[in-house]
């Protein structure tokens, strides 16, 4: 006679099948460099070239937002030299990072990397908004709600690498 399978075991197996194990290498103790390695591997498996190839990397933790620099209380990081094709440079505000879940960290990291590497801008600036969008792409905000799920991140990340979201914009890096 077969032993009955507990519902919790079945639910856990289904959950494990649904969640991409690719992200299991990241946890609350992972470094910015480990997040970068994941980002690079994710870009490559999404069909993009190595986003760091031939570039100087400068990833670091900053302190509380410097409001004079353009970083505001609803921004968890800042990209630098976005028009410099020889670098990828951005900071993550340490106090935000320490309070974030792994999923929030993924969103923030990919958001800042999107500015620094792909020259992505926010789809809208606050002054341009008349209503909230139907979905919030990675480039929408660098801070997402605490209850954001890995599944939501994976969908948004796929759109991120395909450059497929409403309001996609880029920094203008042409020389005058």
Specify the residue positions occupied by each region the protein language model found:
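Short pre-active-site segment immediately N-terminal to the catalytic Zn-binding motif
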Residues: 91-109
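Active-site recognition of the HExxH zinc-binding catalytic motif
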Residues: 106-120
